[in-house]
């Protein structure tokens, strides 16, 4: 279920900043099919911020306006049919995080986009989470560094296009908490990051260079057989 702390003052301010960071991406230019895996906040917290016509939300349990309840590591979708996959703290909250990332990669179309939200372990929020016995961000099974996340994305064939750190706010419920405005604090004291990555198209290449005008001694079938991806 959804962590209850998202409903208090700390969580509500976090959600507002995450919505703003998401809106700033202008993802309507990314394609026609948007898929969110996992709920964060309400079921429409992010989907109503996009102008993409076809938006879908898949979760592992029924909550609000869910389009489909399914295992996130076995998506009932055809491969390469989604233009944008959005993971709002999804990998942080499930044990099978790499399987979920692999399933996301499979459904993203060629040159499609993956957007991920995560908590920054090197931040006041990360420190409070560790010192609280991992109870502060309840429902979070792990904190994933930007370096680790981008490493996974590259391994799955993505090109990281943008990393945005935000929400430099002291994690307290008091109404007078102060945002950390000074640039010297960023990005290391920002609570959250958003990664935008593009699925790379790997071109077909010939095993040996083709010399114009030189007669080829092998058949077309043999040449095609030597092509690698």
Task: Describe every region a protein language model picked out.
Residues 1-27:
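Class I SAM-dependent methyltransferase Rossmann-like catalytic core
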Residues 20, 24-75:
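Class I SAM-dependent methyltransferase SAM/SAH-binding core
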Residues 85-86:
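Hydrophobic beta-strand segment of the Class I
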Residues 98-113:
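A short glycine-rich, Lys/Arg-flanked "PGG" loop and its adjoining helix->strand segment in the class I
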Residues 113-140:
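Conserved class I S-adenosyl-L-methionine
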Residues 131, 140-163:
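Short alpha-helix
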Residues 159-190:
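Conserved catalytic loop of SAM-dependent methyltransferase domains
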Residues 178-229:
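C-terminal lobe and adjacent flexible extensions of AdoMet/dcAdoMet transferase-like proteins
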């Amino acid at each position: 279920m959804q962590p209850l702390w998202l409903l208090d003052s700390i969580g509500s301010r976090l959600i507002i900043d995450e919505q703003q960071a998401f809106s700033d991406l202008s993802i309507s230019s990314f394609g026609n099919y948007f898929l969110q895996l996992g709920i964060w906040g309400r079921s429409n917290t992010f989907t109503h911020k996009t102008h993409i016509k076809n938006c879908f939300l898949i979760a592992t349990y029924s909550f609000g306006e869910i389009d489909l309840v399914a295992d996130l590591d076995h998506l009932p979708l055809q491969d390469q049919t989604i233009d944008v996959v959005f993971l709002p703290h999804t990998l942080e909250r499930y044990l099978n995080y790499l399987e979920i990332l692999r399933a996301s990669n499979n459904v993203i179309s060629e040159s499609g986009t993956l957007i991920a939200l995560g908590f920054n372990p090197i931040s006041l929020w990360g420190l409070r989470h560790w010192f609280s016995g991992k109870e502060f961000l309840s429902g979070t099974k792990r904190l994933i560094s930007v370096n680790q996340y981008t490493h996974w994305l590259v391994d799955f064939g993505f090109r990281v296009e943008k990393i945005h750190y935000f929400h430099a706010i002291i994690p307290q419920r008091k109404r007078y908490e102060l945002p950390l405005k000074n640039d010297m604090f960023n990005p290391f004291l920002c609570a959250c990051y958003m990664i935008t990555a593009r699925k790379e198209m790997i071109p077909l290449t010939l095993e040996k260079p083709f010399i114009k005008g030189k007669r080829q001694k092998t058949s077309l079938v043999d040449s095609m057989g030597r092509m690698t991806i």
